[in-house]
Amino acid sequence: MSLTAQDLRLVKSQRTLLDIPQLQLAAGRLHALLGPNGAGKSTLLGALAGLEHSVLRQVRLLGQPLSHWDTLDLARARALLPQDNPVPFDFNVRDIVRMGRYPHSDQPHPREAHLVDDALQMAGALHLVHQRYELLSGGEKARVHLARVLAQVWAHPDHPQERWLLLDEPTAALDLAHQHTVMRLLRELTQQGVGVIAVLHDINLAGAYADQVLVMNQGRIDTMGACEQVLQPSLVERVWGVVCERLPRHDREGRGWLAFS
C-alpha cells in the first residue's frame, strides 16, 4: 500500500506553498525529504499528515482520502513528529511518551503496561523514564518525542495495519552517535512494514540510510528517486548552490559519498 497525493496545491496569502501534481510513497521504505530552507518540506509533511484541511481530499492513506478518516483511526495509522514540541507543563518522561497511547484507549495492546518502556528503549532513552522533561537536554527531549510517536503507531496484534511515521528533522538535535542510531532504527522499522518520511538536512546521512530521496525546491518536488541516482553534484549545486564531488564508497549497497569544497 502507499501514501499518495494528487493535485496537491496549497496557496496562502497569495503565495504558493505546495504545487505537487502527483506523489506516491510506498510503505516499508525510508523516504528522505531534502531541500533548502523554505522549500516546503515541513508544509508537505503536515499536508500528508492531515494538518492542512483545505487539501485533505488530495491525500490518500490506504486508498482513502484523509477527509474520510476517523480522527482516532488516523492517529493510530500515522504519527507526526514536528520540529518543535513545546511542553507547557511539568511532565515527566513517562507521561510524555504515554500521551502517544491516547488514540489506543479503546483497544489497549496486550502489552500496554510495557509499551512506554519499549518505545523508550527503541529510542535510546529508557534511562530517562523517571526524569522531569524540562530538565533534559535538547537531544534527550528529541529522543523522548521520538519514543512518543513510536508508541503512537505501535500495532495491536489483533488489528494489524499499515503504519506511517512522518518525522520533521528527527536528527537535528542529536549528536553524531545518536543520529546514526536513530537512522538505523528507522531502517529497522521499514523492514517491519512501517512507512517512514523524514525531513533531513544532512545529505550524506540521507544517502547512507534512505531507500528514496525527494528533493524539494520552491514548493515543488524537483527530483525524486534512488539515492545514488539523485544525489549528484550537479543537483546539489543547482538546488543548494554548493559545490561538491561524489566519492566512491565500496559498501554492499554501492552508495556514494559527497565531499564538499
Specify the residue positions occupied by each region the protein language model found.
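Conserved ABC transporter NBD signature motif
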Residues: 56-65
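ABC ATPase nucleotide-binding domains
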Residues: 232-233, 237-261
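Helix-to-loop junction immediately C-terminal to a conserved catalytic motif
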Residues: 49
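Catalytic Walker B motif of ABC-type/P-loop ATPase nucleotide-binding domains
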Residues: 159-160, 165-169
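Conserved ABC ATPase "signature" region
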Residues: 111-128
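H-loop/switch region of ABC-family ATPase nucleotide-binding domains
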Residues: 200-201
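The feature captures the beta-strand-to-loop junction immediately N-terminal to the Walker
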Residues: 34-36
